[in-house]
């Protein structure tokens, strides 16, 4: 069997993504019922972190342990990834020691080079370009609360960042409508828009957050300046009209969900009233990172 990498939603088939989501639901239910299975007994996951992390580190570590495997954490400063040793050599060496590699990095190119040279599965834990694991958790969370996402409308307001890039890919893979409102100069990368449209994504772009959110089934945002992207920082006055507050949520459907990958800058991209309110499912999202990633791990390792 060829090596199964999980680099982006665009690189995995719709059928495999749906298989993983269904598997995540089953694994979550079994855990809640007290069932314990260890399909990854004896397997080791190397976790490489160029960027600090809470959810990614803990969810992959706990997830691997719940599946019976083990983890080893490596930081960019410890490894000097791509500096004292080439990424290609690192990939080849780690492939001799471990069964899979997860990387959270500021550089998507590092992920791709690692994938090209590793002989074990490589998982994208987050890059400056995409965040596919987050979208797996988001779709799982939406469907837990509202049923199949196909045909529904999801709205994004804020910065055109890595989460939005994966959301664009998800819109094509999972067949939902995506409305996007970003300020001028903060647009998502054109390559992700083009890929989504070429694969059936139904996209609508606007400068108006109210227009984007109108009758949406779910409203999604993220921090205005992503970690490691401070050089892209723009004045809050540029983004302030895109804040998700009660007034903006009123334009969505009455039962609309609110999502945020966390950590949230309360009072900036979202108000306390919304993130702590009845629309919010942000902590369900965070929990589902664990279960969605367990399904990704099992798929990558053929378990």
From Swiss-Prot:
Reactions this protein catalyses: carbamoyl phosphate + L-ornithine = L-citrulline + phosphate + H(+)
Pfam annotation, one family: OTCace
EC nos: 2.1.3.3
Keywords: Amino-acid biosynthesis, Arginine biosynthesis, Cytoplasm, Transferase
Coiled coil: none
CC terms in the record's Gene Ontology section: cytoplasm
Subcellular location: Cytoplasm
GO BP annotations listed: arginine biosynthetic process via ornithine; citrulline biosynthetic process; L-arginine biosynthetic process
PROSITE patterns in the cross-refs: CARBAMOYLTRANSFERASE (PS00097)
Sequence positions that bind carbamoyl phosphate: 53-56, 80, 104, 131-134, 261-262, 289
GO MF annotations, alphabetized: amino acid binding; ornithine carbamoyltransferase activity
Recorded superkingdom: Bacteria
HAMAP family: OTCase (MF_01109)
Family of this protein: Belongs to the aspartate/ornithine carbamoyltransferase superfamily. OTCase family.
Protein name per Swiss-Prot or TrEMBL: Ornithine carbamoyltransferase
